[in-house]
């Protein structure tokens, strides 16, 4: 059963970068010569199941601004836009205003960044995106999710603390008599 997560954002208030050039290679190997100050947003996410995932983004407003999407693994730094870049796409299914890629192999527990930007410096606006795959997709930083051992340690500490508190209250009652 496929799992899908949807989110909406806006590049109009985003920072700018020199986006990678599509040049037919994936991952792209050069920077654009004309999209040198393009606004972007980056959405961190991770998956809990390794497998193939699909990505789709559609521009909303202004109508059909020409969006472009990229996928990064481990980290994303707009000052080094070719580092950690896995794939980029413009005009998904040859449709301006839609971008994405299918059957991208992701690894469970790895941090990824889905970047939405414009094709040119004048392309920006709101968009909706979706990520679909076989596992749960969590928006955010993988480092913010506690490890099971941490959860167990917290639970044991809480139980121990409650036990000590009850013992202290019991001792307090018996010493008053």
Which stretches of residues belong to each language-model region?
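Short beta-strand/loop motifs in extracellular/secreted proteins, especially
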Residues: 51-53, 65-67
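C-terminal membrane-anchoring or membrane-association module
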Residues: 162-177
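Short amphipathic, basic-aromatic surface patches that mediate peripheral association
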Residues: 53-60
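Extracytoplasmic beta-sandwich strand-turn segments characteristic of Greek-key/jelly-roll folds
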Residues: 82-98
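Exposed aromatic-hydrophobic patches
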Residues: 98-104
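Extended, low-complexity, turn-rich repeat/linker tracts enriched in Gly/Pro/Ser/Thr and Asp/Glu
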Residues: 60-66, 122-123
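C-terminal edge strands of extracellular/lumenal beta-sandwich accessory domains
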Residues: 3-28, 32-48, 71-85, 104-143
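A short, hydrophobic C-terminal helix/tail in secreted or cell-surface proteins
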Residues: 146-166
